[in-house]
Amino acid sequence: MKIHQVHKLVVHNVVNFAEKCLYSPSNQNVMYKPFVYGTSVSGENFTDRVNETTRIKKNFSSGINTILISPRRLGKTSLVKKVISELDGKDPVIVFMDIYDCRSAHDFYLRYSQAILKALSSTAERLMENAKEFLGRLAPRISITPDLTSEYSLSIGVTPKDIDPEEMLNLPERIAEKKGLHIVVCIDEFQQIGEFSDSLTFQKRLRGVWQHQQRTSYCLFGSKKHMMEIIFHS
């Protein structure tokens, strides 16, 4: 996928974080794990990856597209979230989305637009305003409800026949141009697009739109190394 300048970073298992169980000093009958394993981590549980963190931060700040490829459980998601936590979130604006459960291009477009609008909106009112301003032509049915974390979730009711793929894929670029921003869209489990029906057509559409964007860059990462390599070398 040739979209502007692309840096591909293969994440290796630099430090062996094999899961260990030791006796707790306070209670020898209780086992504990010194390392969090099998889920994304942050704070004191995130160790090493200094060079990778620095490089990705520079990519994000410079508008360079980044591809992370490695097997599962080597810390790709934690690495990206670590970088996001160290940036101020204002310039560039970071959008994070996971498409593991997306089963079609339509699912992707909805997840993509929801994540972008939510990242660019500090309140429910602003979320509604941005949705109407930038997706109003599609006449979507928009509902905003508080979720369990006291934040707001956005539901965009648009049928596949109503979607203009190029308009949806250009959403971050249109917002960035209007508001004078730079945006980085991070997409986890990106290899999932290889499972979509007519995946090659969808991939060509992504390339065709994204390669012309000047204020939006992408960080694409996934755990199925073989599928990721097929996508980016096809």
For each predicted feature, which ranges?
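P-loop NTPase nucleotide-binding core
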Residues: 71-74, 78-184, 199, 216
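A short, basic N-terminal segment
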Residues: 1-66, 71
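A short, noncatalytic alpha-helical element within ATPase nucleotide-binding/catalytic domains
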Residues: 53, 169-170, 203-204
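Sensor-1/coupling segment of RecA-like P-loop NTPase cores
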Residues: 177-179, 183-186, 192-198, 205-234
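Residue-level signal for alpha-helix termini/capping positions
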Residues: 60-61, 88, 177, 211
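Conserved phosphate-binding and hydrolysis motifs of nucleotide-dependent enzymes
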Residues: 49, 75-76, 188
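Conserved nucleotide-binding/hydrolysis micro-motifs of P-loop NTPases
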Residues: 63, 100-105, 192, 223-227
